Every structure is written in C-alpha cells, then in structure tokens.
A protein has these predicted regions:
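Conserved N-terminal beta1-alpha1 strand-loop-helix module at the mouth
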Residues: 1-181, 186-211
Length: 211
C-alpha cells in the first residue's frame, strides 16, 4: 500500500494484512520509510502491517523495522542467520517472514533452511535475485504452483503465496497450493493505482476458494 487511503480501502474489503514496500533495486510500489511508519500507525488493530525490505545487514534491518513501527518484517532477499537472531532478540514482538523466490528445485531447500532458522512464515514469490539488478517482487509473474505445494508440505511454518495472482487465477492457486494466505500487488492495480473493482473481485475469489 502506498497511502493511508489505499490501506483503508484494502481493510474495508477484508484484507488481514497490509504490505508496505521500502526501497528496492527494482519493481513497483516502494515508498519512503517515514510514509511507511505513518501508514502503519493508521492501520486499525487486528490488521497486520508487513514491512517489505531488501536490506540484509542485521543492524540495518533492526533499525529499519524499529523505525517503521510494523508488526511483521518480510525479508525479500536472503539474509545471514545473525539477522534472524538479532530480530528475534531485539524485536521479539515482530514476526519474521522470509521470502523464497521459486525458480526451480532449489527453492525447496531455501524454504526448509528459512523455516529452520526460526521464521514465523515463508512467502513464495516469483522474483529473481540472481539478476544483475535483482528482482525481488512485483513481477506480475506466476511460478510453479506444484512446486509451491511441495514446499508447503515440507515446512513446519505457515506458507504465504504470491506472484502474479489476480481475480482470475487466485481460486486455482488456493486449490492447488492450499497456502495459509495469499499476497497480491499488481493484480489489484490499474496504471499503478489500487483498483477498487479489481480488489473486490480478488477478495471474492479468495473467499470463494476458501469456503
């Protein structure tokens, strides 16, 4: 979400969590850290606030999360084990979600390692951190959902599914993967703006598939 208005629009349509994207090497939607903090303060109780960050330095991560005032940090790139340790010890109330980009069989091992490191959940996305300019989300592309289901079966923590989801495919995605939750960005936007009609159709698709 890029503004308080967008955040409240998502909440009004039933969103359980709000994603706030900090500076990224590529992709749509990053907003300044001070705006992230302002939106996080404005979100009503009971709605989770996710800070999406590409930072990997443990000290930088802790400082950014503390400043943002969110209740969940979504790590979109690989981080050293020390980052998990520091986040857990210094910010124990903040949930840790590790993103794994599904580009092949190695994603299974990456998810298992992340789960073993003590994260609260794993989120599967369709970025590519191996590119010269990393793509760490917001690609609008799907990935192999059969592989996503395998990952869900292999890890002991909740799994979120992202990557190219929209109203037309989210029902199939939920049926095939059975994730804990789904994450959407480009699939509910038109020319970069949150689209009320697309959002309503997406939420309806999620509810129909989950009933």
């Amino acid at each position: 979400m890029r503004s308080v208005r967008e955040a409240w629009l998502a909440v009004e349509h039933g969103a359980d969590a709000i994603g706030l994207v900090s500076a990224m090497p590529s992709g749509p939607g990053p907003i300044p850290d001070d705006r992230i903090a302002a939106i996080a303060r404005a979100v009503p109780p009971g709605v989770a606030t996710f800070l999406l960050t590409c930072r990997t330095d443990p000290g930088d991560l802790v400082e950014q999360v503390r400043t943002a005032g969110v209740d969940t940090v979504q790590l979109v790139d690989r981080v050293p084990r020390l980052a998990y340790v520091l986040l857990a010890s210094l910010l124990p109330a903040v949930r840790r979600v590790q993103v794994v980009h599904v580009n092949g069989e190695e994603a299974v091992a990456d998810a298992v390692v992340a789960a073993a490191a003590g994260v609260h959940a794993v989120l599967l996305d369709s970025g590519d951190p191996t590119l010269p300019v990393k793509r760490l989300g917001g690609t609008g592309r799907t990935h192999d959902w059969d592989l996503s289901r395998r990952i869900r079966e292999e890890i002991p923590v909740p799994l979120w599914l992202a990557g190219g989801l929209h109203a037309g495919n989210v029902g199939d995605a939920i049926a095939r993967v059975r994730p804990f939750g789904v994450d959407v960005c480009t699939g509910v936007r038109t020319r970069g703006r949150l689209d009320r009609e697309k959002l309503a159709r997406f939420v309806a698709g999620v509810r129909a598939a989950s009933s």
